């Protein structure tokens, strides 16, 4: 199943909420992402059917191994670009919004090279 930007955003949000709160329900996701509960319900069903997410009997959301891998990849990119943009003098709110767009479109190769270059600059 091909994941679109919105699906990646949901997985990233589940990961972030799990790190912050431990357990995540659909209502937590709706609040965090500022979307409606029906939107979350639809996204969760799609991600569950795609093998990225599971919901237990208490309605808590859990990332599958594949879902966690995607979420961590997107989250790392998000953090990297946010930090780089802020370091370049971009307003933090703008940096956050721009990082959210960039994280989805950059290739693995380009991201890897940018990250390596940034790490070399720090040494």
Model-found features: residue ranges?
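Helix N-cap / loop-to-helix initiation motif
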Residues: 36, 89-93
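N-terminal helix-turn-helix DNA-binding core of bacterial DNA-binding proteins
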Residues: 2-35
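A generic alpha-helix surface/boundary motif
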Residues: 78-80, 96
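Clustered cysteine/histidine zinc-coordinating segments, centered on FYVE zinc fingers that bind PI3P
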Residues: 84-86
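Residue-level signal for threonine
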Residues: 4, 63-64, 107
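C-terminal regulatory/oligomerization modules of transcriptional regulators
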Residues: 97-123
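Basic, amphipathic "hinge/linker" alpha-helix immediately C-terminal to the N-terminal HTH DNA-binding motif
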Residues: 59-77
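Canonical helix-turn-helix DNA-binding module
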Residues: 26-57
């Amino acid at each position: 199943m091909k994941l679109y930007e919105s699906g990646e955003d949901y997985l990233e949000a589940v990961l972030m909420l799990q790190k912050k709160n431990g357990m995540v329900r659909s209502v937590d996701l709706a609040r965090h992402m500022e979307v409606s509960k029906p939107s979350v319900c639809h996204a969760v069903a799609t991600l569950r059917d795609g093998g990225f997410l599971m919901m237990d009997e208490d309605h808590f959301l859990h990332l599958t191994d594949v879902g966690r891998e995607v979420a961590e990849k997107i989250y790392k990119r998000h953090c990297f670009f946010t930090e780089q943009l802020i370091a370049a003098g971009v307003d933090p709110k703008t940096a956050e919004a721009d990082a959210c767009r960039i994280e989805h479109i950059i290739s693995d190769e380009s991201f890897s090279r940018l990250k390596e270059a940034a790490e070399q600059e720090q040494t």
